[in-house]
Amino acid sequence: VFGAGIAIGVYFENSRSSSIQDLYYDYEITVSDVSASLDILSSSNLSCTETWNNLLTLNDNVYNTAVKLEKYDASNKITDELIVLHKRYDLLRTILWQQFILAKNKCGEQRNTIVYLYQYKDPSINTRGFQTAMSNYLTDLDNKYPDKIVLIPIAADLNVISLDLMTKLYGVKGYPVVVVNEKYKFENLSSLSSIESYLKLNIENSKTNSRSF
């Protein structure tokens, strides 16, 4: 029985190591794709529509790959190895956030950026519950307005220097928080419904402005 227990333990440890290795492989492919794509975007004369479409595709690819990591997080103890891997994905998302800002400055606000900054390491029980509610609300919002918003979730407590600089630039002082269009911050459950109210107003204003040309 003791020998069988050791064998089972070794099997699960090997399986865990293999899963993490697969996540690293996925990350390496994703970061290479993002890097090459951004180089092409910066050196080409793509139209604004093409630029936005490419950035949206990259954001979707990063999100879909990171979902695997989130599922692994949910079923395993958070280790230093997982934190490092998560930090790499959060850096990618920060880079994409920067690129969306550049695209808006160049081409206009074709989408509303909704950046969800949350606690990853050791959130309290209350914070964990709050973040679950916030995440569910934003997911529903993303499904309701799929062609109007860009949702970018980023763990904000992993010491990503570029992210820390951006949060200081936009006056973010605590987490979790939702930053909409780099202008408005929503920090509690009672303010979440205001996000949709703002989006509706902004979408309507965009329609009015487009009709005036």
Feature locations, PLM:
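Loop/turn elements at helix/coil->beta-strand transitions in domains of secreted/extracellular proteins
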Residues: 111-112, 146-150, 174-175
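C-terminal regions of proteins
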Residues: 164-170
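Solvent-exposed, polar/charged alpha-helical surfaces in well-ordered, non-transmembrane soluble domains
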Residues: 136-140, 193, 197, 201
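A short, hydrophobic beta-strand/beta-hairpin element that forms part of a small beta-sheet core
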Residues: 173-188
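Thiol-based oxidoreductase modules, predominantly thioredoxin-like and allied folds used
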Residues: 116-120, 146-161
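Short acidic, S/G/P-rich loop/turn micro-motifs used as interaction or catalytic elements
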Residues: 121-125, 159, 184-186
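Soluble periplasmic/extracytoplasmic beta-strand elements of cell-envelope proteins
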Residues: 113-117, 177-179
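Non-globular targeting/processing and membrane-anchoring segments
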Residues: 1-113, 123, 127-130, 139, ...
